[in-house]
Amino acid sequence: MELIFLGTSAGVPTRTRNVTAILLNLQHPTQSGLWLFDCGEGTQHQLLHTAFNPGKLDKIFISHLHGDHLFGLPGLLCSRSMSGIIQPLTIYGPQGIREFVETALRISGSWTDYPLEIVEIGAGEILDDGLRKVTAYPMEHPLECYGYRIEEHDKPGALNAQALKAAGVPPSPLFQELKAGKTIMLEDGRQINGADYLAAPVPGKALAIFGDTGPCDAALDLAKGVDVMVHEATLDITMEAKANSRGHSSTRQAATLAREAGVGKLIITHVSSRYDDKGCQHLLRECRSIFPATELANDFTVFNV
């Protein structure tokens, strides 16, 4: 999987940072996909500066209905139609997302020429496509807000073709059944159990993308053991009380959570517009003093999961 940050500013855009939007390129050889997490104003314009186009998007996950995470959605949906795109699109979000989209389209005389499904979610598993699952966790924020945990299912281990050959099993289409762990019958009457010739399963990757939040009960479960955790660091340590009063987190809180959850890497985003480049580097240093494996997301930064 690959993360592409389209917007990394909190609340309002700056000259160098747009408001929140993150692309997740699933990069699967047989079932690829492009997912968008949040869609702040100007997201479709940010998308033009990448190698991707709106037609590749098949799922959008909205964390909450504050404008800096949502106001880019109507324009993106309409531009998708105006470009002649007919591929289906599914939007997941909290209660109210359906009313927002339908109202924006209705009062502007707009529509979509592709199948559009809107799923209003609650906490819990919201998607399992056979390769990966997505679970929503409630955040601590003035509006109903969710963070998303994306977990790939474990991949089957490699089939040991050499061991099968040594056992007198010639290569054949039956290898696909063996790779699936099934038992086959050979012409000589022998039964071969595929599970006996498979390497250990390859653990799937796990990713946590937090919505806006102050410290909350669900945070540790959302982040526990993930390879990559994406979390806001809206304000520095000295402004922690102010951040929390508005349903946001400080650098210290993001980094401490990453350490306690045992994540592989922390990526901080959603930084206040009060910070210039020098200030953002200060935020990064504060996080790294607690959790060294921290990176700062800038617009168009790409991270592998």
Curated annotation (Swiss-Prot):
Keywords from the UniProt entry: Endonuclease, Exonuclease, Hydrolase, Metal-binding, Nuclease, tRNA processing, Zinc
Residues annotated as the enzyme's active site: 68
Principal EC category: hydrolase
Binding-site positions, Zn(2+) 1: 64, 66, 141, 212
Residues bound to Zn(2+) 2: 68-69, 212, 270
A Pfam family that the UniProt record links to this protein: Lactamase_B_2
EC code(s) of this entry: 3.1.-.-
Highest taxon above the source species: Bacteria
GO molecular function annotations of the record: 3'-tRNA processing endoribonuclease activity; exonuclease activity; zinc ion binding
SUPFAM superfamilies linked: Metallo-hydrolase/oxidoreductase
Signal peptide positions on this chain: none
Keyword Magnesium: no
Cofactor, how bound (note): Binds 2 Zn(2+) ions.
Cofactor annotation: Zn(2+)
InterPro entries registered for this protein in UniProt: Metallo-B-lactamas, RibonucZ/Hydroxyglut_hydro, Rnase_BN, RNase_Z/BN
Entry similarity comment: Belongs to the RNase Z family. RNase BN subfamily.
UniProt xrefs under HAMAP family: RNase_Z_BN (MF_01818)
Function: Zinc phosphodiesterase, which has both exoribonuclease and endoribonuclease activities.
Subunit structure of this chain's protein: Homodimer.
Stated name of the protein: Ribonuclease BN
Organism, scientific name: Escherichia coli O157:H7
